[in-house]
């Protein structure tokens, strides 16, 4: 009687079984990529709005000037932003914020094209925080001077000048409002960058 030899045959796993989990993982990555790309597009749009607000604030403050129609032999009554060091700081700070926001646009575009790249997001998160701090400081300082211009201070005998220089006060008040609009947009940008970085 002959002994039968047992032969073990290895059957490779079918390609459909081996790749069964791959589409699921790919779908998760695509969903995250779509979410991050949507955030990046919204980030770019908000940056354009922040640029407009910061430039508007700087240009309005920088061109604010009013001369009263009456004068004496020795005095001419004039009010301009360069009469107040705080307003000069405001113009410089808002110009710096606007310049940074313009330079940040290419990095925002990179985040749109490559939503999974963490480097541009981290850089924008850090620099947006710095710009937000500078913008808020300039806006708060200018708002204090605008308040004094409107209301004065009886304790220190500072008189309100807005009754005489109405146009000047309207211009500087508008520039302060625009600066705080830029602050709000920068706050949203920082929060969005933080949300995007959480998903990396």
Curated annotation (Swiss-Prot):
GO terms for cellular component: Casparian strip; plasma membrane. Residues 59-88, 143-175 are extracellular. Keywords: Cell membrane, Cell wall biogenesis/degradation, Glycoprotein, Membrane, Transmembrane, Transmembrane helix. GO terms for biological process: cell wall modification; cell-cell junction assembly. It is a multi-pass membrane protein. It comes from the Eukaryota. Residues 1-37, 110-121, 197-200 are cytoplasmic. Belongs to the Casparian strip membrane proteins (CASP) family. This is Casparian strip membrane protein 2. It comes from Ricinus communis (Castor bean).
